Amino acid sequence: KARVGFKAGVKDYRLTYYTPEYENKDTDILAAFRVTPQPGVPAEEAAAAVAAESSTGTWTTVWTDGLTSLDRYKGRCYHIEAVVGEENQYIAYVAYPLDLFEEGSVTNMFTSIVGNVFGFXXXRALRLEDLRIPPAYSKTFQGPPHGIQVERDKLNKYGRPLLGCTIKPKLGLSAKNYGRAVYECLRGGLDFTKDDENVNSQPFMRWRDRFLFCAEALYKAQAETGEIKGHYLNATAGTCEEMIKRAVFARELGVPIVMHDYLTGGFTANTTLAHYCRDNGLLLHIHRAMHAVIDRQKNHGMHFRVLAKALRMSGGDHIHSGTVVGKLEGEREMTLGFVDLLRDDYIEKDRSRGIFFTQDWVSMPGVLPVASGGIHVWHMPALTEIFGDDSVLQFGGGTLGHPWGNAPGAVANRVALEACVQARNEGRDLASEGNEIIREACSW
């Protein structure tokens, strides 16, 4: 009888993939998962299963395991802690060796870490809470096309948040009327106007017509106000080739910024566009359409801070990041946590703000967070205080809903912003005096 060189059959994941004695390396990618095991499954087994299925493991021992070094390539669950106040929920920390990932590919990183494991039978629910991206990996990415400082220099705007506005109604306007709305907003004092995320190239308004009329509006408003203006021209399309075609046309028109829906468009398309934008001097505005499908559930999916980190690596100069005060959900501390992850170079671990790992971006350019969704002029003091100068505040209905029209709505927002920034610089407290500051500004 031939002797078999390995022991076939199913064995517990924790025997191989749960290694509490492991000391993680500086080059490891670290992940924090919120694991809810099925009833009767021990936490160690569920956590080890997550590490296995998102790296080298499969459900049984295979003879080809002998042809490689599992110790070198396997993901390891190195720590488990129970979640306070939740029954049968754990945070599992997993370390992945750098060799498991293709350089410069967010697509590959996500395919590995969250690709397969979320449908796994042993886990009842699973959520990726945070990732630590080591410098050895982040240095393989270009990151944002330009970053915060270069954007301010391009626009010649300093010392205050930037103001934007999404053109509404988002669908149904003709290109000429759309351009007219853009012009009115920019003339009134906004820095940017924005295509809605679902404005691509529909029968009522084809992309080329929209680009032309918006460019005309832009230049007319610039000539009148003496300020540099921008309109986020949405280049998102059905294919990468078509997307780049639209970005090329935007560049030929000489406009400063284009836009992409990075989750529906996909990370491969987004990284492609980010590279084009850096090579051609375009700023890139990123919308997070579809994020709530992934990040809304508290115990399953992925936290937005992970999607935000991925975007900084893939590339974007602005990204929508919730408002803390408007119509869309977002807790203040958590939101500020990932806003810092977008803007700052070095962020300390701080569990109260949802930051599980210290993250060093080693001088990768920062991304401007965009506050957008149900905010209006009375929120301005709170927004100025919460987000600070390096942000874009976007008022859609809060501009266009003004009873006198778009331009007066834009004027109202600009006046409120300037008043809040001036009051803050004079040492007044925006939290307590905010409404008073806005009322004073009304009488200018």
Curated annotation (Swiss-Prot):
One of its GO terms (molecular function) is magnesium ion binding. The record marks K327 as: Transition state stabilizer. The disulfide bond which can form in the large chain dimeric partners within the hexadecamer appears to be associated with oxidative stress and protein turnover. It catalyses: 2 (2R)-3-phosphoglycerate + 2 H(+) = D-ribulose 1,5-bisphosphate + CO2 + H2O; D-ribulose 1,5-bisphosphate + O2 = 2-phosphoglycolate + (2R)-3-phosphoglycerate + 2 H(+). The basic functional RuBisCO is composed of a large chain homodimer in a 'head-to-tail' conformation. In form I RuBisCO this homodimer is arranged in a barrel-like tetramer with the small subunits forming a tetrameric 'cap' on each end of the 'barrel'. The gene is rbcL. Binds 1 Mg(2+) ion per subunit. Its main location: plastid. Belongs to the RuBisCO large chain family. Type I subfamily. The lineage of its organism: Eukaryota, Viridiplantae, Streptophyta, Embryophyta, Tracheophyta. The modification N6-carboxylysine is found at K194. Its EC number is 4.1.1.39. Keywords: Calvin cycle, Carbon dioxide fixation, Chloroplast, Disulfide bond, Lyase, Magnesium, Metal-binding, Methylation, Monooxygenase, Oxidoreductase, Photorespiration, Photosynthesis, Plastid. Mg(2+) binds at K194, D196, E197. Pfam families: RuBisCO_large, RuBisCO_large_N. The modification N6,N6,N6-trimethyllysine is found at K7. Its cofactor is Mg(2+). This is Ribulose bisphosphate carboxylase large chain. Substrate binds at N116, T166, K170, R288, H320, S372. The active site is at K168 (proton acceptor), H287 (proton acceptor). GO terms for biological process: photorespiration; reductive pentose-phosphate cycle. GO terms for cellular component: chloroplast. It is found in: Plastid, Chloroplast.
